[in-house]
Design a protein with these regions (language model features):
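Helix N-cap/capping motif at the beta->alpha junctions
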Residues: 33-42, 63
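Two-component/phosphorelay signaling modules centered on CheY-like receiver
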Residues: 13-32
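Receiver (REC) domain active-site loop signature in two-component systems and cognate sites
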Residues: 58, 180, 306
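Alpha4 helix (beta4-alpha4-beta5 surface) of REC/receiver domains from two-component response regulators
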Residues: 65-68, 72, 85-106, 360
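EAL-family c-di-GMP phosphodiesterase catalytic domain
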Residues: 2, 85, 107-118, 235-237, ...
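Bacterial c-di-GMP phosphodiesterase EAL domain
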Residues: 141-255
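Active-site residues of response regulator receiver
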Residues: 10, 55, 317
Length: 399
């Protein structure tokens, strides 16, 4: 991280200088400073930073404004909140920042010490280094998304899900990316909003991704009947009455048993027409597809859906998993979600696992499976296949 670029945002000069000194002693050479949110936004607009330390309480455009700007800018570097506010405020701010899809590493309370900064930098160094340029892409319009669909620019990416105890890959989640004419990788947060505005667009996009993923999956693993493949399905897609029949037909045409397919129902799947959505989910279930409730804990009606529909799987949202070691509320949500699912006979998958310590916490809580950068980032199937054939080395465990 010697050549990394870090921005320190704080209205107190002594804090900025203290942080800069600590970072310099840790080998960081490229350090920028801003004394308020406005200066920070100007720097962020013209520089690429690997990490940003940001205060909350500043007189000219506070830290919340900076976080909002980072979210709109699709910033993928590390974000560290620094403040003298009470722990509950810091924890809530972290959760808010994750709604912007920001990579919150932690909260640092003032006064700042070298030991605290060293711990933060050590954490950052352990994490995969995302490609900021790849995700710094504005939101596409419906017309632009239609162009990419017509030009066959969609690519199916996959992220493995591992059994937390054996470290064997038990399934894959199919994700979608766009690779444009200039080989620029465009992430879903830049085009899903446009797709969700049109029932036709989101259906077309979903079907294209499913077809591409099934083709790759069937070719790469023709005899792996125990390996599951999961798809994200939104409410607008489920409102199409013909979708279950289409899915059954396309899966069968690839020679894949429906029991290998998991339909991950996102929170948006709960909103448009609850009765229609429930009926469609039951149709999928009767066709022998497995059902998963995605991003559990983030929606107002998640528990009601869990009661109403015979789900096979519950996925704990990454916002709770990420800080379950530092946020008592997140830890409680994770533990109680697992306990509830177990009582109902439902498998539990944790999203967003990035460290061994978080993995250990989940194991002790009884979580079945997990996915995240600790194991593998999403990628084309030919890049993921080797991990499936070679289990991740398991640590010695006493539990």
């Amino acid at each position: 991280m010697t050549h990394s670029s870090i921005l320190v945002v704080d209205d107190q000069q002594v804090i900025r200088h203290t942080l800069a000194l600590c970072l310099g002693n840790l080998g960081i050479q490229n350090i920028h400073e801003a004394e308020n949110g406005k200066q920070a936004k100007d720097l962020i607009a013209f520089h690429t930073f690997d990490a940003i330390f940001c205060d909350l309480d500043m007189p000219i455009e506070d830290g919340f404004e900076v976080l909002r700007f980072l979210g709109e800018s699709k910033f993928t570097g590390a974000v560290i909140i620094i403040s003298s506010q009470e722990q509950e405020v810091l924890a809530s701010t972290s959760n808010l920042a994750r709604l912007y899809d920001l990579r919150i590493i932690g909260c640092v309370e003032k006064p700042i010490t070298f030991q605290i900064v060293q711990k933060v930098i050590d954490t950052i160094r352990m994490l995969p280094n995302p490609n900021n340029k790849a995700k710094r892409y504005r939101e596409l319009t419906e017309e632009e998304l239609t162009h990419h669909l017509n030009s066959d620019h969609l690519e199916a990416y996959f992220q493995p899900q591992l059994d937390l105890r054996t470290k064997k890959v038990k399934g894959l989640e199919a994700l979608v990316r766009i690779i444009d004419e200039n080989d620029l990788l465009i992430y879903p947060d830049s085009f899903i909003p446009a797709a969700e505005k049109s029932a036709t667009l989101i259906l077309n996009l979903t079907q294209r991704v499913i077809e591409k993923a099934l083709t790759s999956f069937a070719k790469e693993f023709p005899n792996r009947k125990s390996l599951t493949l999961a798809f994200n399905i939104s409410g607008k897609v489920l409102e199409n009455q013909e979708f279950p029949k289409w899915l059954s037909h396309i899966v069968n045409s690839h020679g894949i048993p429906p029991q290998q397919i998991i339909c991950e129902l996102t929170e948006t799947a709960i909103a448009p027409d609850p009765t229609t959505i429930d009926i469609q989910m039951l149709r999928l279930k009767m066709m022998q597809f497995k059902l998963s409730i995605d991003d559990f804990g983030t929606g107002y009606s998640s528990i009601a859906k869990l009661h109403a529909i015979p789900f096979n799987e519950l996925k704990i949202d990454k916002s709770f998993v990420f800080d379950c070691l530092t946020n008592a509320k997140s830890a409680a949500i994770v533990e109680q979600s697992i306990k509830m699912a177990k009582a109902m006979g439902i498998e539990v998958v944790a999203e967003g696992i990035e460290t061994n310590d978080v993995e250990d916490f989940l194991l002790k809580a009884g979580c079945d499976s997990g996915q995240g950068y600790l194991y593998s980032k999403p990628g084309p199937l030919d890049e993921i296949a080797s991990l499936i054939r070679t289990p991740v080395p398991n640590k010695e465990r006493t539990e």
